[in-house]
Amino acid sequence: MGSTQSVSGTPARPLPRNKHVSRVADPRSPSAGIQRTPIQVESSPQPNPPAEQLNSLKQAQDPDPRSPTLGIARTPMKISGPDSQCPLVKELSEVFETEVSETEVSESISSPVLGLPQETPLSSELDLPPDPDPQVSLEDQLLPWSQTELNSKQVFAKEEAKQSTETMVSGQTSDKPSRDPETPQSSGSKRSRRKTNNKVLGRSPLTILQDDNSPGTLTLRQGKRPSALSENVKDLKEGVILGTGRFLKAGGGAWEQNEDHDKENQHFALMES
């Protein structure tokens, strides 16, 4: 068989060499010859910036305590200088201060003149006699109010008593026979109604509970109506049958319907076949 180590007979071909791909670390990249990314682009030589620009950049990159991310100055810093106020604001503030000072001076001048009439009421108050007893005066003022309240309460109680007596008398004297006996009432009213019905009608209390719709009582709607057949049977029993097919009632009643037809037939001769 063969040996353990196999050696190729043909020499290996060298890798293809491309001048664009020679600078790329990984030649398997699809964009090997296209310089797109900053990694692939060679750094161009840049001139050194002056020292003034470096200082300005450092000042701009100073951490802003108001920024949520330190090292990034996003909001502009407020310039706080000695002359930050507008000249118009200064003028207005000065005018306002002068007006306030003038008003204070005028008030201080007018205060001694106005002091005399303020003291005059004090002398008039001293002339008035003091109240002898403040508690007694308060009680005197409260007495008429309490008396009026008591009078109103008494009148209200009397009116309520009158209304209650009137309702009791009207409930005892008034009788309502048209009211349905099954309607709910108090026990006293039920007993009084049953007693009066027993005396007047002479029936037992159970008969009061029977209405028109109860099965125990017969009304005109529930009664039996006489039928035509029953009337004919009665007529046959009471009447006398004649030979011509018509009958006359025993009491000499009226002729039946067949009578008219028989009268018409009497004018013509009977045909015998």
Curated annotation (Swiss-Prot):
Segments for region (F-box-like): 90-124
A GO CC term assigned to this protein in UniProt: cytosol
Post-translational modification comment from the UniProt entry: Ubiquitinated and degraded by the APC/C-Cdh1 complex.
Pathway connected to this protein: Protein modification; protein ubiquitination
InterPro entries (alphabetical): CDCA3
Oligomeric form and interacting partners: Interacts with SKP1. Part of a SCF (SKP1-cullin-F-box) protein ligase complex.
Entry remark concerning the domains of this protein: The KEN box is required for the association with the APC/C-Cdh1 complex.
Full protein name: Cell division cycle-associated protein 3
Gene source species: Rattus norvegicus (Rat)
Gene this chain is encoded by: Cdca3
